[in-house]
Amino acid sequence: SSGIGYALCEEYLKQGWNVIGLARDGTKIPNKTIDNPKFEFVKTDLSNFDSSKLIIDEVFKKNANISTFILNAGIYIPDSLNDFNFENAKATFDTNVLSIYLSIELIKKNFELNSNYTLAIMSSTAGYKGLPKSILYGPSKAALINLAEAIKSEMHDNLNVKLICPGFVETPATKVNSFKMPYLMSPKEAARIIYSKIYKKGFEI
C-alpha cells in the first residue's frame, strides 16, 4: 500500500495490466488507484497466517489466469544489538520470510509449477551485508536471497524466477536511517526499473 509495492501497482496499471494488491491497510492507497477498474484491493495481514491463507486461496481460485506474482510483504524495525527483542525479531521474520513461504505454498497449490508465469521475490541489498540498525531486517532479506536462489536451482522450464534487491529507496523505512544512503531513488523510479527488467533474461534485478 506504500513504497515500492504501491509504486509497482501504479507501474503495472500504467502498462495496462489488471492488478490485485494485498496489504494490511488500504487507507494509504489514493482514490485514483482504488477507483481504477483494473485494480482490486484485498485487505489481509500476511503475518496472520490462518486468515491470510483463506483469503489468498480465495483470490487465486477467482483469478485462474494470474501470470505474475510479486512477493513484496515486508516490515522494517530499526533495531540494533543493544535494543532488539525477540518479539520484534518474530514480527520481522513472520512478515518478511514466513509470509513469503505461505504465498509460495498457495501458488503451488493453485497453479501448475510448469505454468508460464513469473515469480518475483522482493529482497534487498541489505541482505548481502550487515548494516546499522538492520540486525533484524538484514537477516530476513538474506533469507529471501537464499530462497530465490534455491528456487532458481530447481528451475522449471516455464517458471520465470526473479530476485529483486533494491538499494536505498525513499520510503518510511529509510527515513529513520541516520547514515549516508548512496544512490537514493524514489519508489516510482525503482518500480520503473523493476518493470523494465522483470520479463527479460537474467535472475537478479
What are these regions (language model features)?
Residues 72-77:
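Conserved NAD(P)H cofactor-binding loop of Rossmann-fold oxidoreductase domains
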Residues 124:
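Residue(s) in the substrate-gating loop at a strand-loop-helix junction
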Residues 1-18:
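Canonical Rossmann dinucleotide-binding motif of NAD(H)/NADP(H)-dependent dehydrogenases/reductases
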Residues 104, 140:
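Active-site helix of classical SDR
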Residues 82, 129-135:
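Active-site loop immediately N-terminal to the catalytic Tyr-X3-Lys motif
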Residues 80-81, 85-93:
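Substrate-binding pocket helix/loop in short-chain dehydrogenase/reductase
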